[in-house]
Amino acid sequence: MINMNNTEIGYGNHALTPPIDGCFVAGSLTAIIGANGAGKSTLLKTLAGLQPAVAGQITFTGGRVPQMAYLPQQAELDRQFPIVVQDVVAMGCWPQSGLLGGINHQSRQRINQALSAVGMQDMARQPVGELSGGQLQRVLFARLLVQQAQLILLDEPFTGIDSQTVGLLLEVIHQLHTEGRTIIAVLHDMSMVEEHFPHALWLTPQGHCWQSAEQVLVQWHHSHGSSCSFSSRPSILRAINL
C-alpha cells in the first residue's frame, strides 16, 4: 500500500496540487485524471522517486519501497539512441542481474516470452528508431513484463498509438492486475477509465477526488455538464450529454 499524507506535488517550492490524502491499495488498478497542468505526470514521477514531494509524506507499507517499473510518456524517450528491440526489453532484467551482470538463459526466455506477449517476437533485432509509435509502446510494455515489478506506473500509455495496440496493451494491464500487481496510470480518455479502471484519482487545482472510478466519474461528468447512468454492467458508467 502507498500512503499519501497531506502530500503536495510540484517542483521546488511550487505546489501543483493542494494537499493529497489517501492511499493506493496493494493490487489495485487506478487511473489518475485531471486537466493539463494538474500535476498528474508529476505525481507519477514523485511516486517513482524521481523527484521529492513539495510537502507532506509518501510512505509504503512495511517501510520498504517495492520494486517498481515506471513508463514515461513517449515524448520523453530518445528514439535516436542506437539500440535494437530485444536489448530494450533486456533492460528489464537489470534489477535482478545488474547493469553488467549479463543475460542468462532464464532471462533470455523471459525476454522472448514478453516479446511474444506483445506481438513483437519477429522484430527482436529491429532498431527502435525504425518503429512506429504503437510498436515502440509494445516494446516498452514487454520490458515491463520482464521487470516483474510489483508497482507499475504508466504515464499516458495509450496516447498516439493505434487501436489494435491499445487493445493488446489493455489485455497486458488486466493480466498484470490479475496477478496482483499495483498499477497506476495517467489517462485522458474517460471512456477507457469507465470501462477498464476500478479506481480513480481526480486532481484539480481546488482539491482531489479519490474513490471508485464510478464515484469519481459521476463528479467529473457533473462538473463538465454531463451526467452518468449505469450500463448493463454494474461496474461501468456511461456519459449522457445533457
Predicted regions and their residues:
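Conserved ABC ATPase "signature" region
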Residues: 105-123
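Helix N-cap at the start of a conserved alpha-helix in ABC-type nucleotide-binding domains
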Residues: 163-165
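H-loop (His-switch) and adjacent beta-strand-loop-beta switch element
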Residues: 197-214
